[in-house]
Every structure is written in C-alpha cells, then in structure tokens.
Amino acid sequence: MDFLNYPEPLADLITGLSRLPGIGPKTAGRLAFYLLQQPQVAENLAEAMIRAQREIRQCSLCCNYTDHDPCPICTGEKRERTLLCIVEQPRDVVSLEKTREFKGLYHVLHGVISPLEGVGPEQLTISKLLGRLEGVQEVVMAMNPTVEGEATALYLSRLLKPLGIKVTRIAHGLPVGGDLEYADEITIARALEGRRQI
C-alpha cells in the first residue's frame, strides 16, 4: 500500500499496525482511520500497551506472562506439583486452563525448535525447564501438532526419559497444523484426557 499521500504520523501508524501478526496494509489503514476517529479508544489502547510493556514479565518458574512473580498458577496451592505440562506459548496456557481439566503446573518454551528459522534449544526456555524438574513424575507435551512441535516434543522426551520422568503427549484431537489457541474447550479437554506416553 502506498502511504506517500498520507501525513507522516498516519503513515507511521499504518506501518506499525501492519507489522502485527495477521494485519495487512489494508486492515492497518482501516484501523488507523478508526483510531483517528475515536481518540478515546486510541488513548486507552496506547495506555494499555504501555502498561502491559511495563508490568508484564515472565514468571521466574514457568516462563508464562504474569504481573506477579511467581505467577498465580505456580503459587496455586491446589495445583498438582508432580505433573508438568510443556507448551509453546503463553496463549496455550490460557487455552488449556479454559478446559479446567489440567490440574498440574506449566512450562512455556516461547517457541519450538525450528532450524530453518534459526531457533535451536538454546533460544527456548529449556535450561529453566531442566532446573525445575525436582519432584515431577509426569511431563505432558502439549506442543502444537506441527513438524516443529513434534520435533521439539521428541527432543525434550529424549532429555527427560533418562531422568525417570514419565513423558506423555496430548492426544491428537487437534488438527495437524492447528494451534491450541483456536481449538474449542471440548477438543482440548479430549486431547488432554487421551494423552499417551512417548
């Protein structure tokens, strides 16, 4: 999209919005004009973004996003501490928590192993994971059913099995190439119930 005819601040806003995932130049333009017509919405959005950047951080235990460290899940007294679920992203924790089926703790990798994108085990939170396994009896791999998700689950299972930890994978009630974030609660709950040892 050609922004040459727009004032520089508007062109910068459109460019910035178009860098967000799933937002192309046309949608970014529509959003920019909406925000110009709704100054209170724009101001509230800007304040919320600044506040989130300032206050949200990774939990020092599970690496999920939180405004309290450690996060409420890690400090929850009713959580099953012998059960740990490994997920790719913080939004996957939200999807699993919506089902109310999983009672254990989580560990967020913040990605998957993807050599083509230059992401190896060192770029993920695997070292923190290995440092928090004391007392854990079962690890549930809840990576998305993609080639990278499967490769990451296999890599982690090879690290964890020699430690005597039972390693399971959620059942594939999820479509290949799909994300936990977009699955409904029933599908995720069935996938958790049907997890299998790997």
Curated annotation (Swiss-Prot):
Alphabetized UniProt keyword annotations: DNA damage, DNA recombination, DNA repair, Metal-binding, Zinc, Zinc-finger
Zinc finger (C4-type): 59-74
Superkingdom per UniProt: Bacteria
PROSITE patterns per UniProt: TOPRIM
All residue ranges annotated as the Toprim domain in the record: 82-175
Disulfide bonds: none
One of the protein's GO biological processes: DNA repair
PANTHER family (UniProt xref): RECOMBINATION PROTEIN RECR (PTHR30446:SF0)
Protein name in UniProt: Recombination protein RecR
